[in-house]
Amino acid sequence: MTATLDVPEQNPDLVLDQSADDYWNHYQLTFALYSVSDRAIPSAYDGLKPGQRRLLYQMHDSKLLPGNKPQKSSKVCSAVTGNLHPHGGASMYGAAALMAADFQRVKVIDGQGAFPRIQGDIPAADRYTEMRLSAPGAALTAELNDHAVPMVPTFDGEWVEPTVLPAQWPVLLCNGAVGIAEGWATKVPAHNPREVMAACRALLKTPNMTDDRLCKLIPGPDWGSGASVVGTAGLREYITTGRGHFTVRGTISVEGKNCIITELPPGVASNTVQDRIRALVESGEMSGVADMSDLTDRRNGLRIVVTAKRGHNAEQIRDQLLALTPLESTFAASLVALDENRVPRWWSVRDLIMAFLQLRDSVVLHRSEYRLEKVTARRHLVAGLMKIHLDIDAAVAVIRGSETVDEARKGLQERFKIDAEQADYVLSLQLRRLTKLDVIELQAEAEKLDAEFAELNDLVTNPESRRKVIDKELVETAKLFKGPEYDRRTVLDFDATPVSRGDEDGSRERKVNTAWRLDDRGVFSDSHGELLTSGLGWAVWSDGRIKFTTGNGLPFKIRDIPVAPDITGLVRSGVLPEGYHLALVTRRGKILRVDPASVNPQGVAGNGVAGVKLAADGDEVIAALPVSCANGEAILSIAEKSWKVTEVADIPVKGRGGAGVAFHPFVKGEDALLAASISKTGYVRGKRAVRPENRAKASIKGSGADVTPAPAE
């Protein structure tokens, strides 16, 4: 038995003569281009994504301006999706809630109700909240009625919408943006609006301004959530090229046994940090945590308290939080935005500011052209009225004596030498208004229109005149950002050292900021996250702690070392000859000579022990040197105006944990050492003028020139 399949006759108009691969590739490409240009990537000019632009336009059209009554969020978002945005209402409300969030650098929407206060907050349902434009938000739409930007039909052709908003401040740089599309992603950090406005004025005046000047005007990001930028690596590259990686750190303060988290890096949610801490405690990686509580509320903001166990240091817990959780992370900036052809590309900070200034020039030009057209038309009508006023009785007689409007129009044109447009305007006036025309008022209006015509004509034809107007308007717009809420929130801690590195799998390792290299004195390091020890080894931190590792050739991860502000040196003490000690030199001119036997070897997970007791006023270890009394070795210490050579034999051997002894008295105007190293006795740049001195004697004043030790003769 043979089965047959009845195939209905197909409409040839519905049949595609195309392979499935070609079909899907075509439609995937179409969707990709759509997601890039109409959803995820903002414009470089007004700094807004299409959904954000449509939301603000709808609010402007609904008169939801500052001072006016706000409208229920569900009604606003429904109007946007119904009239302008062919997508779901949930995504529109999410975008609106983000623009009304407290952690937004500049709040574009004034939200009434439970909108997000910290990153990760979920807003109340749209039926419970209301919204209207804030003052900065209204500045983005203020010139829409001046025909300042192009308008295009909406998706259904029933409305029109602007291709860009006539923004009076650069939204993209001030508020930042994050978006992922097919093949493209943008991640723009927020910046301080005052700094950005100052940079706009500077580039408007000097378009070829140097990068150094730009980096001074905009030294780095400034998020509404606060946090801090650690170090300078990647910042200049980001500002000058639009792409760069830099480290961002949350704010953790120590109060007794508690570590209090009050600020998070951008894009990091509170629950993400708490979940990570719980996982670390459960896995044993953070064994010193006794408790964690979330005391966050809407009045005081973020407050997560992590309590250290008895016998554990809260400072150490703080360091582990920075190293092992997203509280310190790398921000990979990528300034991707759409150009005038709606094509994505990379922009530098300078490029984005110039694009904004180009938008402002276009806005001033188009609104001036629109206003010039209106002024020209009014001047023409006023000129006709002034001719009519020369003999108002004759004009009234012509109008009353005419049987039709056409006859009256022709009569006025012939009698007063005016054109049809002027005659129609006269005929549109009521007779009582026509007879009460005041020549003085007409003359004053004509003079005012003449002056405005000349000014507008100059703006249309002269780019330099538009530049002056743009600068004046930037000054006025900058007044929006005078309040304390626009003070810099993100700390730029350029002198700090990043302590952690995040990998794709979530693991983190310690980073040593300096690339230590192996030399004949045993200083070493490895740039791949491991310290390769041989025998026994020291690791010395700038806060005076030391770690004595065990194992013959045993590598240990930097992640196993408790975090400190910086690692001063790494010394292989196990291979030193008999009689060698470790000298720890502090910035305040003290030295501690320690016998390695005073420190017991520790495993890789050891927390280290006290090395030298530091002064409270910013003291730190600046050098860790293996020293010996043999071979005439001495310590060369260098300050800003002086240097000193101290023989090792004059430095007493002390127990670890002491404050050390003073060995470099400072000359007037000094209070800190710059460096210290091992020197052959009596030689500084080949000069024997620098002699070894007893430890307590004054140092020798120098010129500040290079005084590094010279090779032995």
From Swiss-Prot:
The residues covered by the Topo IIA-type catalytic domain are 41-504
The catalytic activity of this protein is classed by the Enzyme Commission as 5.6.2.2
Note down the stretches annotated as region Disordered.
694-713
KW Isomerase (keyword) present: yes
Needed cofactors, names only, are: Mg(2+)
**A single GO CC term, please?**
cytoplasm
Q: Which UniProt keywords apply?
A: DNA-binding, Isomerase, Topoisomerase
TM stretches of this protein = none
Q: Which residues form the active site?
A: 128 (o-(5'-phospho-dna)-tyrosine intermediate)
How is the co-factor bound, per the entry?
Maximal DNA relaxation at 5.0 mM MgCl(2).
Q: Which residues form the signal peptide?
A: none
The protein's matches in SUPFAM superfamilies, at most eight in alphabetical order, are given as: GyrA/ParC C-terminal domain-like (SSF101904), Type II DNA topoisomerase (SSF56719)
Enzyme type, top EC level: isomerase
Describe activity control.
Inhibited by quinolone antibiotic ciprofloxacin and coumarin antibiotic novobiocin, but at much higher concentrations than is usual for DNA gyrase/topoisomerase.
Catalytic reactions of this protein: ATP-dependent breakage, passage and rejoining of double-stranded DNA
Q: Which GO terms describe its molecular function?
A: ATP binding; DNA binding; DNA negative supercoiling activity
Instruction: Give one GO biological process term.
Output: DNA topological change
**Entry similarity comment:** Belongs to the type II topoisomerase GyrA/ParC subunit family.
**PANTHER family on file:** DNA GYRASE SUBUNIT A, CHLOROPLASTIC_MITOCHONDRIAL (PTHR43493:SF5), DNA GYRASE/TOPOISOMERASE SUBUNIT A (PTHR43493)
General function of this protein: Catalyzes the relaxation of negatively supercoiled DNA in the presence of ATP or dATP but not other nucleotides. Individual subunits have no activity. Not able to negatively supercoil DNA, it can however introduce positive supercoils in DNA. Relaxes positive supercoils in an ATP-dependent manner. Catenates and decatenates DNA. Generates dsDNA breaks in the presence of the quinolone antibiotic ciprofloxacin, showing it is a topoisomerase.
Q: Its quaternary structure?
A: A complex of TopoN and TopoM, possibly a heterotetramer.
In its UniProt entry, what is this protein called? Answer: Topoisomerase subunit TopoM
Its source organism is Mycolicibacterium smegmatis (strain ATCC 700084 / mc(2)155)
Q: Which gene encodes it?
A: topoM
